[in-house]
Curated annotation (Swiss-Prot):
It is found in: Cytoplasm. It is an enzyme of class 2 (transferase). Its EC number is 2.3.1.1. It catalyses: L-glutamate + acetyl-CoA = N-acetyl-L-glutamate + CoA + H(+). Belongs to the acetyltransferase family. ArgA subfamily. InterPro entries: AceGlu_kinase-like_sf, Acyl_CoA_acyltransferase, Asp/Glu/Uridylate_kinase, GNAT_dom, NAGS_kin, NH2A_AcTrfase. Pathway: Amino-acid biosynthesis; L-arginine biosynthesis; N(2)-acetyl-L-ornithine from L-glutamate: step 1/4. Pfam families: AA_kinase, Acetyltransf_7. Residues 295-442 form the N-acetyltransferase domain. It comes from Buchnera aphidicola subsp. Schizaphis graminum (strain Sg). This is Amino-acid acetyltransferase. The lineage of its organism: Bacteria, Pseudomonadati, Pseudomonadota, Gammaproteobacteria, Enterobacterales. GO terms for biological process: L-arginine biosynthetic process.
Length: 442
C-alpha cells in the first residue's frame, strides 16, 4: 500500500507542471474511424472528458472511413478510389452522410456522459457541432471526377473560438457544405491539420494502431523532425501503405509543424490511457513531431547548477564520481555541457583542457537514471570531442572506476598514469585507483 501511495504521489508531482502548462491551450484531437471502432474507444472518450475538465480547449475531428466502407458493402455500392482518394458519387454520398451523422450522435452522447461514474460526476460537458467548415469540390483529375469528394475552402475560426471560450468541446465531422449548399466528403486529416493551423493550436493529436512510429528494431521513435517525418512516409509508401491512419497523420503533421503548431502527437488507440500518458509525462508514450527538438544540448550556465547537482549527487554518494562542492561547480560551470529536456537536466559532462599538452579531460559524466539505456552518453561524448577539436586539443582522457568497457567500446584505450599531464598526475588518487583511458581525436 505504501509503495502504491508513493507511486501516486510521484506521478502527481510529475504531472502538475504539464497540467498547468496545458490549461487554456487549444488541442485538436483527430479520431480516425479505426480508433472509433476499437474496443478502447470508451477509454479514449473518458480521457478526452478529463482533458476538458482540466481546462484544455478541445476540438475533436473524427473520420469514418471503415464505417463508410461497411455501409457501401452492405448496399452493394462500388468503392472507388483515385490516387488513394475516395470518389464520392451521389449514391456513396448518402452512405457517407449516414455514417458521419451516426458517429456524430454517438460521440456527442459518449462525451456528454464521459465524466459519469467519476469524482467529476455532475460536471456538464457541452459538445457543439455545426457548419464550421465550408467545402469546395476536388473537381476532375486525369479525367476522373471526384464528384462529392471535397477539400476545405475556409474555416470559421471565429465561431469555433467562440464555442471554446464558452467552455464547449467542438466536434467536427468529415462532411461539410459548400457555398452552394452541396455536401462534400472531406478527409479528417485535412480538417484536423487546417483547423490546428488556423486556430493556432498548441497540439494536434492522432491515433493509430501502433504505439506511434516504429523503427526497424520495433521500438517507438519518440521524436521526429520534418525531414525525419518525410523519410518515415517514404518508408511506409515503400511498403505499399498510402492510406493508413499513421501515414495520413504524418502527412498532416509536416504541414502543421511548418505552420506553427508546436507539437503533433501520434499514439495508439489500443493502449488504455495513452492520451494521458503522452500529455502528462516527460517522455510520453508515442511519437511527437516537432520543428525543434524538445531536447537540447548546450553549454551550462550558473542557472544550471541546481540541475547538475541533482544529477551528480547520487553518483557521488555511491563513489562513482568524485565529490564537487557547489562553489567548485559555480567556478567551473563554463566547462560543463548539459542535455536538457522540458527544463530538466538529464545529462551532463565537463571538459577540462590542458593546453600545454594539447589534451583534454572528460569528467563528471552523468545521465539521469530514466535515460541511461539511450544514446545520451554517446551524444555527450560526441560533443566533448567537437569542443576539444575547437580548442586544438589532440586527445581526450577519462578517469573512471565503473565505465571502463563503455569507453573501450567507443575507441578509448587503457593508458598508464605517466601519460597524464603533469598537473593532473600530481592530483591522481592512488587509493581510488581509477582506470585511465584515452582516445586520439585526429
Amino acid at each position: 500500500m505504501r509503495e502504491r501511495t508513493t507511486e501516486l504521489v510521484q506521478g502527481f508531482r510529475h504531472s502538475v507542471p504539464y497540467i498547468n502548462a496545458h490549461r487554456g491551450k487549444k488541442f485538436v484531437i483527430m479520431l480516425s474511424g479505426e480508433a472509433i471502432k476499437y474496443g478502447n474507444f470508451s477509454g479514449i472518450i473518458n480521457d478526452i472528458g478529463l482533458l476538458h475538465s482540466l481546462g484544455i480547449r478541445l476540438i475533436v475531428v473524427y473520420g469514418s472511413c471503415p464505417q463508410i466502407n461497411a455501409n457501401l458493402k452492405e448496399k452493394n455500392i462500388k468503392i472507388t478510389y483515385h490516387k488513394y482518394i475516395r470518389v464520392t458519387d451521389l449514391l456513396s454520398l448518402e452512405q457517407v452522410k449516414q455514417a458521419a451523422g451516426r458517429l456524430q450522435l454517438d460521440i456527442t452522447a459518449r462525451l456528454s456522459m464521459s465524466l459519469s461514474n467519476t469524482p467529476l460526476q455532475g460536471a456538464n460537458i457541452n459538445v457543439v457541432s455545426g457548419n464550421f467548415i465550408i467545402a469546395q469540390p476536388l473537381g476532375v483529375d486525369d479525367g476522373i471526377d471526384y464528384c462529392h469528394s471535397g477539400r476545405i475552402r475556409r474555416i470559421d475560426k471565429k465561431a469555433i473560438n467562440c464555442q471554446l471560450e464558452n467552455g464547449a468541446i467542438v466536434l467536427i465531422g468529415p462532411v461539410a457544405v459548400s457555398v452552394t449548399g452541396e455536401s462534400f466528403n472531406l478527409t479528417s486529416e485535412e480538417i484536423a491539420t487546417q483547423v490546428s493551423i488556423k486556430l493556432k493550436a498548441e497540439k494536434m493529436i492522432g491515433f493509430c494502431s501502433k504505439q506511434g512510429v516504429i523503427d526497424s528494431q520495433g521500438k517507438t521513435i519518440s521524436e521526429l523532425l520534418p525531414n525525419n517525418i518525410q523519410n518515415e512516409i517514404k518508408k511506409l509508401e515503400g511498403k505499399g501503405d498510402y492510406i493508413s491512419s499513421t501515414i495520413r497523420f504524418l502527412r498532416g503533421s509536416i504541414k502543421a509543424c511548418k505552420s506553427g503548431v508546436n507539437r503533433s502527437h501520434l499514439i495508439s488507440y489500443h493502449k488504455n490511457g495513452a492520451l494521458l500518458q503522452e500529455l502528462f509525462s516527460r517522455d510520453g508514450i508515442g511519437t511527437q513531431m516537432v520543428m525543434e527538438s524538445a531536447e537540447k544540448i548546450r553549454q551550462a550556465n550558473i542557472n544550471d547548477i541546481g540541475g547538475i547537482l541533482e544529477l551528480i549527487r547520487p553518483l557521488e554518494k555511491k563513489g562513482i564520481l568524485v565529490r564537487r562542492s557547489r562553489e567548485q561547480l559555480e567556478m567551473e560551470v563554463d566547462k560543463f555541457t548539459i542535455i536538457e529536456r522540458d527544463n530538466l537536466t538529464i545529462a551532463c559532462a565537463a571538459l577540462y583542457p590542458f593546453f600545454k599538452e594539447k589534451i583534454g579531460e572528460m569528467a563528471c559524466v552523468a545521465v539521469h537514471p530514466d535515460y541511461r539505456n539511450s544514446s545520451r552518453g554517446d551524444l555527450l561524448l560526441q560533443t566533448m570531442k567537437l569542443n576539444a577539436k575547437k580548442l586544438n586539443l589532440k586527445k581526450i582522457f577519462v578517469l573512471t572506476t565503473q565505465s571502463i568497457h563503455w569507453f573501450q567500446e567507443r575507441g578509448f584505450i587503457l593508458v598508464d598514469v605517466e601519460i597524464l599531464p603533469e598537473s593532473k598526475k600530481k592530483m591522481y588518487n592512488y587509493q581510488r585507483c581509477s582506470k585511465i583511458l584515452m582516445i586520439d581525436l585526429f
